[in-house]
Amino acid sequence: MAKKNQIQKVYITENDLRNATTYIPLMKKVEFVDQCATVCFDRLTITPDGSVGAALPYMYKENSQLKSRFLMGALVKLYLGKDFVPVEGTEFLMSADDYDRYAGAHIFNQIERMKGKGVELRDIAFDLLHDFKDLEKRLNSEIYGLLQAQNDVVSRFQLLLTAQTSPEAFAAQRAELDSLMKEFEALKQGRSTGEQ
């Protein structure tokens, strides 16, 4: 009996590994990291009491599924030299379905198993996986650094102060103060004439 929603898996051959790139130049890695790291975030809106209203400056968290799809895209395109249709305007972002075709076939385990198929394939597999881990480490470091900068308490506090002292915010606060002053004057006037 066939399973429903079965993923069409992608398998690599010994020739695929022989033709693979085992080293991506540093500046190509930097280009990949620059292109991908800045979009691997989700914005969180946090209010002082957890309700909807005047929000504090945004905080950010890592979007791990985007990062996984970017990394799989890099493995497939840069190292294995295979094509896929990128999504969302970047050459390395795989669709979730394409990601599942490779991840569901345990692509990294396929490469690991090639180590047992002779010295040539073993060396290629070791070199490819080592260089890919370097790329992954660079992406992780960049995402971590960006998250730290974006979620920095002092920076967020400065944004909050800036938002509260903008000309628009100041004008709104001034209008509220004028309204309160008028109410106060009316109350004061009412007391002096004996009205309550």
Tell what function each PLM region has.
Residues 37-196:
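Short, surface-exposed, charged amphipathic helix/loop patches that serve as local interaction elements
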Residues 1-5, 193-196:
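Intrinsically disordered, low-complexity linkers and terminal tails enriched in Pro/Gly
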